[in-house]
């Protein structure tokens, strides 16, 4: 019940690494990174990447699995108050797992194409919807810097409107909470844990430098697959 209010079963399953069945309940595991922790330096330090992946993302996975198991037990017992109480934990930790699983794919070392501008249909779509790649970067940087507290800034494909849009989400809310037709192409984590060890409290510097390791190839692949 609570899961359906977060995202569809299909959305949850996509790219998140199921690992086993636990009493009929599917659980999740921490995905491996497709590069070494230090591979994104100097844009993002190896220390940040290791802490971000091994500690923060792992905590979301652990707490998500725990909340899902508690939900499973509560439903089996007909414990409606506990079911309702678990909704926020499932949304927060499940969203954290979804968002970070996308985030790691949105990054790539420079030697593997990180930072190279998007080409093909995504490049054309960016020019059409925002005027230029530079204008898109400025818009996402501005909205990410202005986001109060913690959250994410996204480049998304709106499949209903058939256009690219920039959205922000608070805390660990996944993009789907902003609309069921939004497909995340690129998400940038603006929680302090994503940059504080290196950039202190200067979020704009982090936002400026992360574009040097953005994996536009992955974003283009998602766009090609999902574009109507």
Swiss-Prot record:
Pfam families: Sod_Fe_C (PF02777), Sod_Fe_N (PF00081). Mn(2+) binds at residues 52, 100, 189, 193. Its EC number is 1.15.1.1. It is found in: Mitochondrion matrix. It is an enzyme of class 1 (oxidoreductase). Binds 1 Mn(2+) ion per subunit. One of its GO terms (molecular function) is superoxide dismutase activity. Keywords: Manganese, Metal-binding, Mitochondrion, Oxidoreductase, Transit peptide. Residues 1-24 form a transit peptide. Expressed most abundantly in parts of the plant which exhibit a high metabolic activity. Expressed in pre-shooting flower buds, vegetative buds, immature fruits and fully expanded leaves of basal shoots and seedlings. Its cofactor is Mn(2+). GO terms for cellular component: mitochondrial matrix. The keyword Metal-binding applies. GO terms for biological process: removal of superoxide radicals. It catalyses: 2 superoxide + 2 H(+) = H2O2 + O2. The keyword Protein biosynthesis does not apply. Homotetramer. PANTHER family: SUPEROXIDE DISMUTASE, SUPEROXIDE DISMUTASE 2. Destroys superoxide anion radicals which are normally produced within the cells and which are toxic to biological systems. Belongs to the iron/manganese superoxide dismutase family. This is Superoxide dismutase [Mn], mitochondrial. It comes from Prunus persica (Peach).
């Amino acid at each position: 019940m609570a899961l359906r209010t977060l995202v569809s079963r299909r959305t949850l399953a996509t790219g998140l690494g199921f690992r086993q069945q636990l009493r009929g309940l599917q659980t999740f595991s921490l995905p491996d990174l497709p590069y070494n922790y230090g591979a994104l330096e100097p844009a993002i330090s190896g220390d940040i990447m290791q802490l971000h992946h091994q500690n923060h993302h792992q905590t979301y996975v652990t707490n998500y699995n725990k909340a899902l198991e508690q939900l499973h037990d509560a439903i089996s017992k007909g414990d409606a108050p506990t079911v309702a109480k678990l909704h926020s934990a499932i949304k927060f930790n499940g969203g954290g797992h979804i968002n970070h699983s996308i985030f790691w794919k949105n990054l790539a070392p420079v030697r593997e194409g990180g930072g190279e501008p998007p080409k093909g249909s995504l490049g054309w779509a960016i020019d059409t919807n925002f005027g230029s790649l530079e204008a898109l970067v400025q818009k996402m940087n501005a909205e990410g810097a202005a986001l109060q507290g913690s959250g994410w800034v996204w480049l998304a494909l709106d499949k209903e409107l058939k256009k690219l849009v920039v959205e922000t989400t608070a805390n660990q809310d996944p993009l789907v909470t902003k609309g069921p037709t939004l497909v995340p192409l690129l998400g940038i984590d603006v929680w302090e844990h994503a940059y504080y060890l290196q950039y202190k409290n200067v979020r704009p510097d982090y936002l400026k430098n992360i574009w040097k390791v953005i994996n536009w190839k992955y974003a283009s692949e998602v766009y090609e697959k999902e574009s109507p």
